[in-house]
Structures are given as structure tokens and as C-alpha cells.
């Protein structure tokens, strides 16, 4: 590429990556802020729908009110429909009443006439009988006197006797006829007919009276009135007015009748009350709903603004954490005691930047906060590395930006909706009473409208009905009882005339006699009092005989207030909502409409949250698979394989060298491992079955909560599968001739390479590639047998194609000023053993360990972590070592350094801006490129040959600090202490120290390919998948104070803050 070969033509202040100001300018696009904005927009949509619902509620309320007006009009028109049905009944009742009144009046008059006739006839009969008694008694007295006289006067009395007897016979006949006539009209029974026997006047035959006396008696007999004449006259006088009244009654009632068709019917009256409808409660509820929604939107916007500010701080904090991580990485790579060097002190450190290392670095840089949280959780919960890896993967998985966006949208949306739904209850309670009052007032309005309409109709109807009643009443009074004025007076006159006739008759009979006064008094006492009573009765009839028909009240067609309220309450409830059903009235419907829209939005946010839940379930499934499922499947496959193969054949497969005192590992047992002698049995490459388990790589040395590890009692290593490199399937014929030549110089044969190639021809399947990463840790691992970086970098076999990158953090000038001759006298250190395996770094980042002298009196390790900017003294149990200086600097290479570029940048030949620079002053020797580079070249061997092979197997190495960690801080060599390695900058180097050393940090193994040609070669096994971030919590870092920093050096402005925060 051109930018690798040519320097830039123009100077620019921009970089290819975003710096802090650029990141701060994008803080408003964070997922939480976008989630809040999304929720605010959804709430705004709900607010618009609520406003539409309010308008719709008012429209529906008016429409309901119109319908209520129609219903109220129908209710108010009840008098019309009541009158239509009532008029016929009223007419029938009036007509029946008239017919009954006529019959009653006629019957009454008939009975009255009979009673009057009876009374009059009774008095008449008594009078006539008494009169006859008096007359006949007087005549009998006279006859007796005459007989006495006739006895004297025989001649006179004989004639008188005959005449008297004849008169008595006539009297008997007349009396009999009279009594018979009375019996014919007497309803109380027959009156016996008295018989007057003629007196015996034989003695008067000889007596005769004078003629004048006899003529006077005959004349008296002729003057007595007859009974039949009086009777006929009384009947004519009494019966005539009654007959007239009866005829008038019949004629009057025949002309009077009530017809339902002629009765009035009220008109339908329309009720109107919607113009007086109070809609303020709807407006108040709507305003409160809109107000609450707007408050929610404003709160969301305020929270969004606050989150923007907090996100700026958070972005600054992440930038600071990233800078701290970069400082960790830079100083970790520089101070790693296992860093591979090129045979000289000034050689460039080489690290293995595999895909795994870069992916871990990228993940940590992408999620620094998640990484920090997981590290702290692991430290506090004292989780195992496997559990820590799973937890960090799980958090990175479920908080992947799209998944985190779903989570935030769902949580913020549901939280806001639930808050609004909870606020609906107080809102309903607030306006429920007001709505009830409004409904009550509306009911009263409807009731008053109905009452007013019904009162008007009832008044008109009653007036018309009463007019008809007055007409009928006048007709009856004038036509039926008009005879009173014309008959009462004549009847009274008739009775008076009857009384006068009786008195005249008595006067005629007894006038001039001694009985006149007695008879007159008797008639007055017997008949006069009764006549007076009859006159009074007729006068009462004249004054009171009138028909008063009942009138119709003005409120006859009105309903009672209870009935009107009962009729108007459902109408008001239908219009306003009564709250007795599911809609909870007007307020309930209005609030429920908005609540329903919120519930629909809740479904949307619930879907977002469910999507994040699906991601969580997927992550849990993946964790379950890699922690339980896959190991079980691999175990089943291995058991099936072992069962199918039975006893493994001997020969062909070489087991790495192992000390005889340690028990065989599981890999050696499964593959026919050797005995205590060290070299195991071999198996031919042709006999290797497919999916043969390979020796597991060294597990991660990351232990954020490091405890001194206790070795397994059995000393048996656990099986962990090795993940193949991306170049695992490169064919063996692609090995270059140069590599073959280098193998020959190393004393290796092609057979060993072929054996290694055949051993890796059948890599484990995809299912078992990551078993070593997620496998369960049963106990502390024993030393694994894995091809070291030195062998892989020298042989470049098919399983290793990891690039070698030189990372330089020090300039040449700084190295000369800082390091000086710190390693110049390293060859003079006594007791140095090139075969003694050096300690494995806590950082475990570089592909190969760097050989250093452990007889130095004082070694200082660098680390970015600091506490209060003070140097920490070396303590027991912690090891320190100086950094490895780089080979050259930008100044030495001739590249002009920009003032804004730190001295650590552009100091490597791998840098694109150094591609066109001339060859450095001190190029790397060619020999390390051809011959295998020793793993520990910091101190030369005693015979000054760093590449010689030992003729015998090495002694078992036991690191002194494993048993006694304080040995590193003591001067074990007795020689003068060499100067500590200092950083390339002008300020004192920061000090880092391993605070929790463990025995598993120093694991030795022999490469399988070198056992045949190199029976004694001790290599340090390392895990190529470890990054400096894995051991972050195992190192304490002390940075120098700010006052000691060189002013000309570009300084990270967040270094102190990062150190304090971290």
C-alpha cells in the first residue's frame, strides 16, 4: 500500500481515529438518548391520539345529548299518548255515569212519587175514616134520640125507622165501596170492610118526629164528600209533576253524551337542553391528560439533555479508561519479562498479535465499562477464569449495541407508560365526583325540561276537558232539573190547596157545631205539620238539586318528581355515562381511550424488551452449551473413540519430555504416554484416528482474584482442547526451502516435521475448537505439552501462522539515556543458567519468554497503575524486572518527529511512516533469522554460545519464588546489583509488581518435534490467547509524579486521573 511506502505529503492535525472532542460531538447519538427520543415521539403520537379522543368524546357527548333530547322529547310527550288512550276511557266512564244517573233519577222520582202518594193516601184514609166515624156516630146518636122520640111518637118513628134502615144500608154500601177502592191502591194490605147493622127501630113505629128534624139529618148525609173523588184528585195533583220530571230526565240524558273523538289530545312538545350542556369537565380532563403527556415529554427531553451531559462525562470517562488500557498495554508489553528478544539487549521485543489477542483488545476497547465491571465482579466474587470469561462474554453479548437499544427502548417505554397508567387512577378519582355532579345537574336539567313540557300539555288538556265537563254539567242542570223552578212551586201550591180543601171539608162538616173547633185542630195537627215538612223538602230540592261534575286538574297528565327522575336518569346516564357499567361513565371512557392507546404502545415496547429477552435466552443457551453440553458431547465422543480403539498401539506418537517424579498426564495416558523415564511411547502417524484429541494449550493465566494455587495431589494435567490457528490447514508442501534449511541447521529432521504435520493433519472439529476456552476447570493444570513459540516461529509449521510484530515504546536516545549499560555486564553474572526456565510474566502476552538473570539484586517492573503517585517498594512475594529497550528510535532512523506526536509513536520499522526510512544503524543480525532464537537471551550463556544444545536432559526446575516468593527480593548471587531498566522517557519509570504469584505461572514443557533431536531442551509454555487486560488486577502500578516528567514529552492529560480512577 502507498501509505506504507511513502511518507505523507501534507501535514494534518486529524487522525485516522476519533479523538475525545470528536467523540463528545457524537454523544447525543447514544442509544439511551435515541431510545428516549423514540419514546418521546411515541408519547407524542399517543398525545395526538388522546387529543383526537378528547375531541371525539366531546362530539360523541353532543351526539348523545341530541339522542337524549329525542328520548326526553318522547318522555315529555307522554301526556299525548296518555290522553289518546285515556280519552276513550274518560268518554266511556262519563257516558256510563250519565246513564246510571238517569236511571237513578227516574227511580228516585218514582219512589218519591209513590211515597208521597202513600203518605197522602194514608192521611186521606185516616181522615175519611175519622170523618165517617164522626158522622156516622152523630147520626147514630140522632137515630137513637129519634127512636126514643119515636117511642113516644110511634107514628112518627115508624117512618123514621124505615128511612134510617135504608140509610144504614146505603152507608154500608158506600163504606164498602170506599174501602174496596182504598184496598185497590193500598200496598200495605186490605182494610176490612166494616158493616153497620141497621138499628132495631121497632119502637119508633109509633113515634114520629117532626119533619124538619128529619130533613136536617138527610141534608147532613148528603153533604159528606165521597172517597173516590178525593182519591182521583190527589193522584192527579201528585203524579203530574213527577211525570213531567221523568220526561225531562229522559229527554235530557238522551241528548247528553261524551265522545272520545271530540276530547282534546295534547300536541307533541320538543324538549331542548343541549344548549345548556356543561362540557367543562371534558375540557378539564382532556387538559390534564394533555398536560401530563406534555410533562412526560418535557421530562424525557430534560432526561435526554441530562443524559447527553452525562454521556459526555461517560464518554470522557471511557476515553480515560481507554487511555489507561492503552497505557496498560504499552507498559505491559514493554515490561514483560518473557518478551522475546533477538539475541541482543537492543533488539526489538516481539509479541504474538494473534486474532484472539486483537479481538480481546478490540472487545475491551469497545466495551471498557463492561470489562471493568466484569473484572470487579470477578475480583469480588472470586470467580474462576472460566466463569469470568463466560460472564464477560455474556455481558458483551446481551449488551451488544442493537440488543442494548432494544433493552433501553423497552425499559424506558414501559416505565413511562406504567407511570402514566398509574397516574390515570388519581386523575379519574379527581374528576369522578365532578362528573357525578355534572351528571346530576344534567339529570335535573332533563327532568325540568320534561316537567315544563308536560305541565304545558297537561294544562291545555285539563282546560279543554274541563270545558267539556262544564258543558255537560250545564246541560244536565238546566235540562234535567229545570222542572224544579216549574214544579216545586206548583207542587207546594198543590199541597197547600190539598190542606185547604181538607180544612174546608171539616169546616163544612163541623162548621157551626160543637165539633168544629176540635175537628179543625185535629186536621192541623194531623196534616198541617206534614204539609209543612213536604214544603221544606221541596224548597231544599229547589235550592240544592244541581249536578256538580268533577273537574280535571292542571297536573293530571304530569308525572311525579320521582317518576320524572326515574325516566331522566337513564337518559342522562346514556349521554354523560353513568359509571355503573364497564365504561365507568364519561370520565372512564375518556381516560380508558387514552389508556388503551398507552396499552397498545406498551405492546410495542414489550416487543422490544422481548427481543432483548430472546437475546438473553440465546446467550444463556450458548453458555449452557459451552459449559455443559459441549463438554458432555466431547466426553461421549472420546469415550466412544476409546471404546472403539481398545488398547492404543505403541510407537509413532512422541510424548513430550516429563520429569519421572511427576505422574503421567491424562494426554499421556490416553495416547500411550511414557513411563517415569520421560519419553513416552510413540504411535505412527498412519494409526492416528480422525478427531484425535490434541494436547491442550496452556490455559489463561488470568486470575483477577489470585490465590496461591495448590497443586493437584495427583499432579495430573486436565484435558483442554487447543483452538487451531487460522492457518491450521496449510499443506506441508508449502514449507519454504529456507525453513527446511533452518530445520537442518537446528539438527531437526524432516521426519520430526512430518510427525508434527501428521499429528496436526486431523484437527478437532468445529464443535471442539473452543473447548479449551470454555472447558470446565477441575483443578490446577499441570504443565501442558504444547509447541512453544520458539519452535513454532522457527519451524513455521502448518498449525502456526501468527504474525510477529515489533512494538517499540522507547526511543533510541531515551534508551541510551535511560538504560545505559544495564545489561552490559549481564554476562559477568555468576550462576546464570541458560537452561533454567525464567519466570512467566503475569501479562503472558508475548509469544516467547525472555531470559533474564534472577541473580540481580534488585529488579523493578513497570506498570501504569499508581496510587497517589507514590512509588511502591518491593514487597515479599512480588517480582520485578526492568523493561527491554527497543532497538532504535525515530531520531536514530532519520524520521522527523512532529511536535504533537509522542516519542513512542513512529519508532518501529513496522510503522507505516518508517517504511521509507533507510536501514537502521544497528540492524538485527541475520543469525537470529536463520537459527532458532533462544527463549531467554537477556543474559548470555557461560560459554557465550546462546544457541548450543545441552547434551543431557535438564534438571527439574523449581522456581525459587514458588516455594519462597521473597527470594526474588533477596540478593541470591552475591554479585553487585545491576542498574534497573528504566523507561525511555526522561521521567522515572513507573513500577509494576505482581502481587499474587502462583505456581502455574511457570509451566515447562518440551516440544514434541524436538524430543528426538533435542533430548534436553526446556521451553516455557505460554497461552497465545492471553492479553494484557486479562491480568489487569494482578498488577499494581506506580507512576512518577507529574513534576518529574520531561516538558518536551507529549503527556497524556488523563494519566493521573486514570490512575486514580482505576
From Swiss-Prot:
Q: Which residues lie on this side of the membrane: Cytoplasmic?
A: 42-102, 316-396, 626-1062
Which keywords does this Swiss-Prot/TrEMBL entry list?
Cell membrane, Conjugation, Glycoprotein, Membrane, Transmembrane, Transmembrane helix
Keyword Ligase tagged: no
Residue ranges annotated as transmembrane are 21-41, 103-123, 295-315, 397-419, 605-625
Q: Oxidoreductase among the record's keywords?
A: no
Q: How does it sit in the membrane?
A: Multi-pass membrane protein
What's the family?
Belongs to the PRM1 family.
Please report the name of this protein according to its UniProt entry: Plasma membrane fusion protein PRM1
Organism of origin is Coprinopsis cinerea (strain Okayama-7 / 130 / ATCC MYA-4618 / FGSC 9003)
Q: Which gene encodes it?
A: PRM1
